[in-house]
């Protein structure tokens, strides 16, 4: 079942949203989040698999499986290179977190009522960036 029905999608788009989640749900006995991740990730080297359990194993469980990112960012010191999924690259200098904030301002997202309250930017940061958060570690 697609949770984000056509009418909801069109309404969000007309409101100026340009980042609208598409959600699919299915009975847990037909497929597992891990098996879905393994199938999708075998076609793409970049992706994210997040799982959560709220209220016990059988209640409120949700998973996020995301592949084929819009862009990838690689940081080396004060230089951050953004590579779009079409291969185009941009090089920026400055604080990686400030740069990321500026990049994400253009995305106007909407949340669906039946989704948990989560962000819509997924990825990972390298170990070296901990010094920007906890300088004494």
Regions of interest found by a model, annotated:
Residues 1-137:
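Signature of the chorismate-utilizing enzyme
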């Amino acid at each position: 079942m697609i949770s984000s029905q056509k009418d909801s999608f069109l309404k969000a788009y007309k409101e100026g949203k340009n980042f609208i989640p598409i959600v699919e749900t299915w009975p847990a006995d037909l497929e597992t989040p891990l098996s879905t991740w393994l199938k999708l990730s075998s076609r793409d080297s970049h992706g994210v698999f997040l799982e959560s359990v709220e209220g016990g194993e059988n209640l409120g469980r949700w998973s996020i499986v995301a592949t084929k990112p819009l862009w990838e960012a690689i940081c080396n010191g004060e230089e951050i290179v953004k590579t779009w999924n079409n291969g185009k690259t941009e090089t920026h200098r400055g604080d990686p977190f400030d740069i990321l904030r500026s990049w994400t301002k253009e995305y106007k997202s909407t949340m669906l009522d039946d989704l948990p309250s989560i962000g819509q930017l997924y990825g990972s940061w390298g170990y070296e960036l901990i010094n920007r958060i906890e300088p004494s570690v």
